[in-house]
């Protein structure tokens, strides 16, 4: 309620400025990687995994890129933020994102790779990022011990 009261006290110009700054931050994160993507990249690299970040033009559809790719484990990691399941940019863009996700999932699995999708449904906090990292490390550990059978290569966290 407090946030709503604060918002209601803002002028239209202030509201417009806040929305523009928020939109810019989200667009920048989609180009440069989200905080969670960068955290995972950093932590995996510390653990000596060779991780390719925002790899482009290697799936059949050159417009698709993967967030993180561990080639030695034949594993792709996708971090799906709110725009993958909420109409952050409108209904049309949500549908477009979901179609793109389905296409990417199919292309990754077609190549015999593992796809780990991390669904970012909570606000980013250090605790949340550590929890996600621990779950991811458990999955990676299982993949290292035994590469999953074909019907078990799609994993959600």
Residue ranges and their predicted role:
Residues 1-157:
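Nucleic-acid endo/exonuclease domains
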């Amino acid at each position: 309620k407090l946030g709503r009261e604060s918002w209601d006290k803002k002028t239209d110009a202030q509201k417009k400025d806040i929305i523009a700054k928020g939109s810019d931050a989200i667009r920048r994160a989609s180009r440069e990687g989200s905080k969670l993507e960068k955290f995972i990249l950093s932590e995996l690299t510390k653990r000596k995994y060779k991780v390719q970040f925002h790899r482009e033009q290697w799936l059949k559809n050159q417009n698709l890129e993967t967030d993180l790719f561990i080639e030695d484990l034949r594993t792709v990691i996708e971090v799906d933020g709110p725009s993958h399941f909420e109409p952050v940019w409108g209904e049309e863009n949500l549908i477009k994102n979901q179609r793109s996700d389905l296409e990417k999932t199919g292309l990754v699995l077609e190549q015999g790779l593992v796809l780990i999708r991390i669904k970012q449904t909570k606000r980013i906090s250090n605790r949340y990022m550590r929890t996600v990292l621990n779950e991811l490390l458990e999955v990676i550990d299982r993949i290292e011990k035994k590469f999953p059978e074909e019907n078990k290569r799609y994993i959600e966290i």
